[in-house]
Structure formats: C-alpha cells, structure tokens
Amino acid sequence: HGAAFAAARVPVAWQVPPRSSQEPVLVLNGNQALGLGVLASGMEMVAMYPITPATSVSHYLARAFQTVGGYMHQAEDEIAAIGFAIGASYAGKTACTITSGPGLALKTEFLGYAVMAEIPLVVINVQRGGPSTGLPTKVEQGDLLAALYGQPGDTPKVVLAPATIEECFHFVILARKL
C-alpha cells in the first residue's frame, strides 16, 4: 500500500525511457569483463591467490576453463601464484596472474625477474578503492605507481589502465599480444 500512497502524493521527478533497440545487451562488471578477456585472448593458464576484489575472476575462469580448456591454479600465496605463472610461461604456455594492490606488492621481486629474464607474462591488478583497503575518505590510483615503479632497478614494462568495463575486456587481449 505504500507504493500506491506515494504514487498518489509524490510527483514523478523523472522517467526512464524504454530502450530503443531490442538487441540483447551484455551487462557485466569489470571482473567479468576481465575473465571474458582472458578467454578471448587465448590465455591457457591463470594462477592467483584469492584476494578482494579480484577473487570473482578466478571463480568465473575455473568454471569456464572446464568448458573451453585451460587451467586455473589457486596458489598458496601471491608469490607462488606469480611464480607458477612465470613457470608456465617459460614452459611455453600463455599465462597470467591476477591480484590486487597488496598482492601486487608481494609479486614485485618475481615481476622484476620476469622482466629481466624476458619471460612473457600478463599481470592483472584489480585495484581497490583507497587509500588503505576501503573508501573511508577519498579514492586514489596508487596501484598505478606501484605497477610502474614498484620493482627494483630498471624494469621496463607496459601498464594498461582501463577506464571502462569494455576496456577491461579489450586490454587483456591487447596485453596478451604485447
């Protein structure tokens, strides 16, 4: 009865017009787009340790790889995850590891090793809102600086920073080709 009461007394502020097209629309969040990008890129192996907010990518890929082929490895920690991905890449598989800010910090030594040994690797960092582990006061993009400069020495690498969910999909494919 509350809805009828409100409808009779509260003016409508705005209306959402119906869609003009009846074509199907794919509605995704960023992690789902990343997972689809991993599949579309032909990535054969993903290694990761569960970490918020990246974990749902591994859940999606574990199911998808059973259907399309591929291997999803849940490592015992972040360092083991990148080590596993580097080993798979060294053995000739297309591999990536997925993490978030604190995990990226733990992967830095192995990431520097992969760069210096010229072992191809895609690292997907699902950035948390920050500072810290939440959104208490503001947001920042500190993981970008960590991705660019977090390794010791001169470790040149390509860092792609998607601004949209669509770019989350396309940038995984692009990263696989670089």
Across the structure, where does each feature detected by a protein language model lie?
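Aromatic-enriched
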Residues: H1-N31
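Mid-sequence acidic-hydrophobic segments that form the walls
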Residues: G2-F5, G150, L178
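Glycine-rich phosphate/diphosphate-binding loops that line cofactor/substrate pockets in enzymes
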Residues: F5-P11, A33-G42, G87-S89
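Glycine- and acidic
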Residues: P17-S21, L39-M45, T67-G70, G92-A95, ...
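Glycine-rich phosphate/diphosphate-binding loop of Rossmann-like nucleotide-binding domains
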Residues: P24-A54, H59
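Thiamine diphosphate
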Residues: T52-A147, L160-L178
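The feature captures the short pre-catalytic strand/loop hairpin that immediately precedes
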Residues: L148-D154
